[in-house]
């Protein structure tokens, strides 16, 4: 039986000859068995990263190597000895996995994981739990599998979660939705579900995965996690709902206290656009310098400083 612990990433280095061998196997597997069906399927690179994560997990759990001829289902990658169906999820990036990251307002943002809604809502994809991983790769120009023996690749084992809890608590974002990444934003090109790392079940070691049984899955299905938003976005949304007359300052103070955030949060739009609007209101005679001075205490204009 599994014993809950807070998620803490487990790094597995995929370097030297041993790591290269695993990367070579992932490359060979995807080359021989590309997934060319299904809407919004993963790219060849994404399929390669997913295969590598599964190959690594199988190796460290003492399981047989990945084999397309005896894969039990499209919905999951392997069965645990307890009968639990596991799907390994992997996201690749050039940075190591961090549980929190700083933006340029020095306020931490919590890390998240991503799911495809079409998989989550397809009952034919029979799976009990997802094992969430993150693959640190070389630069985008040089990270094509299998890479080289000298390159540094690291797989982070982040934790696990039941499919049913992701369906219940994850936040669905339609294609084109905006999300924050580091010091900038991007829009999702595909439909997405965000689920935050802090809400995963942690693993002290990878072989602890073998202890998960149906009672653990049921307990996770019933578990109530925290917000699947960054604390910063929760405050931004609260500000917006106050402006729309739905919430009030009591809710803002509550969320700020719960998140332990006292700094001013940077807006999504440029602060220059805020000042432009305020100056227009002043020209219309609706505000005075007092409001502009107050805004200057909270927001900072961003002058052009050259390329």
What are these regions (language model features)?
Residues 1-81, 89-307:
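Nucleic-acid endonuclease domains
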């Amino acid at each position: 039986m599994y014993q809950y612990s807070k998620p803490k990433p487990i790094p597995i280095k995929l370097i030297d000859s041993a790591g290269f061998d695993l990367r070579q196997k992932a490359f060979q597997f995807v080359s021989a068995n590309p997934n060319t069906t299904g809407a919004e399927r993963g790219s060849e690179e994404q399929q390669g990263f997913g295969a590598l994560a599964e190959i690594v997990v199988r190796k460290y759990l003492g399981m047989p190597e990945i084999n397309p001829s005896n894969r039990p289902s499209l919905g999951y990658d392997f069965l645990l000895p307890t009968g639990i169906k596991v799907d390994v999820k992997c996201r690749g990036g050039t940075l190591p996995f961090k549980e929190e990251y700083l933006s340029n307002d020095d306020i931490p943002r919590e890390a998240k994981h991503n799911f495809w809604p079409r998989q989550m809502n397809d009952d034919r994809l029979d799976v009990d739990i997802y094992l969430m991983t993150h693959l640190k790769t070389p630069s985008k120009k040089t990270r094509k599998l299998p890479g080289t023996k000298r390159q540094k690749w690291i797989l982070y084992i982040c934790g696990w979660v039941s499919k049913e809890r992701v369906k219940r608590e994850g936040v669905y974002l339609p294609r084109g939705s905006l999300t924050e990444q580091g010091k900038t934003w991007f829009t999702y090109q595909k439909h997405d579900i965000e689920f935050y790392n802090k809400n995963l079940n942690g693993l002290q070691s990878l072989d602890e995965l073998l202890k998960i049984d149906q009672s653990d899955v049921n307990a996770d299905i019933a578990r109530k996690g925290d917000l699947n938003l960054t604390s910063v976005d929760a405050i931004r949304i609260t500000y917006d709902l106050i402006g729309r007359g739905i919430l009030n300052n009591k809710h803002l103070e509550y969320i700020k206290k719960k998140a332990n955030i006292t700094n001013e949060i940077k807006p999504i739009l440029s602060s220059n656009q805020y000042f432009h609007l305020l100056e227009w209101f002043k020209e219309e005679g609706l505000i005075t310098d007092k409001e502009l001075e107050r805004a200057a205490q909270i927001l900072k204009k961003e002058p052009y400083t050259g390329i």
